[in-house]
Each structure stands twice: as C-alpha cells, then as structure tokens.
Amino acid sequence: MNYKPVKAVMLRNNDKFIDVDSVITVTNFKMNFREDIVTFTATKEDGSASQRWTEMNRIINKVIS
C-alpha cells in the first residue's frame, strides 16, 4: 500500500487514509473555515462508521494505491 502525506484539507469524498486503528474511507466531507476544521464520516474496513473532525492543517497519510 502506497501513501503520501497531505494536509487534511486536501481530502475528498471516497479518499482513503491511514489512521492509528485502520484504513479509513472518507464520506460526507465538509470544511468549516470559521473553526479551521474539516468534518467527515469515517468508515473503517470492518464497516463501522463514525463522525470525525480534524484541523485543516493536520498532515495525514493518504492512500494512493
């Protein structure tokens, strides 16, 4: 699995990134410029989903292949 570091603000729907607990698929991506955060629904490989948020400038490891 290849990945590259990108800022969280560069994520889009259906992108995948590596988190501490598994590979996460992003859906329902929204940017909140007032609070400088992004919110999204994170779906793990086992099918469980949760609402998450992170700072726009946070570096994440986006899966590219």
Task: Please name every model-derived segment.
Residues 27-53:
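Basic/aromatic-rich interaction segments and small domains that mediate binding to polyanionic partners
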Residues 1-3, 21, 46, 52:
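Short, functionally important structural connectors and interaction interfaces within domains
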Residues 12-14, 38:
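Residue-level marker for the onset of beta-strands and adjacent loop->beta junctions
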Residues 47-65:
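Intrinsically disordered, low-complexity, charged/polar segments
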Residues 1-12:
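Mixed-charge, Lys/Arg-rich low-complexity intrinsically disordered regions
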Residues 16-25:
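Short coil-to-beta-strand transition motifs
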